[in-house]
């Protein structure tokens, strides 16, 4: 049910291995790139994701190898130094920098990378998301100016950092989906912008307040 050339985030083996089998053995939907979040903390796996595979382009990741190799940015602390939202792209550039002012000295063991705000956003080019089919014309009035999330907890893993970077770097070029049935923490606040398409949630620039029922996220594309 994924749109062509999509990126699909999965988590566990049960989510991922059947999809790998379908692509590798059956040759089915090789244009879709499967990104397993439980592996995305490994530098070797990030290397693979950045390369073209089958019929899918490499995953858009702005970090270079020296910025994500093993032992570097394995976790990033969240420090609420400013309240106003910052663009996710700007924050990723901040985290990737080695300038002294981008490091925190609040912890024992030396300077660590940090994110200076909980409030992040991805700007939305309304014309672009209509032209490339992210949003259907009949929903054009629902498009938000920016997709906003608020980070939870005190830190991010490398895998979570890569998810944010992929969404920021992609900039609405390729369809991005999260698998259904993942823990809500894995959605990182994007569930308010989910659109159910078959058995996957597509990230769209339309905000839908979640219902009280657990795992009841976003809106539904009934045309799939």
Q: What are these language model-derived features?
A:
Residues 1-5, 22-224:
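ER/secretory pathway lumenal C-terminal domains and tails of membrane proteins involved
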Residues 17-21:
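Phosphate- and divalent-cation-binding pockets in alpha/beta enzyme and binding domains
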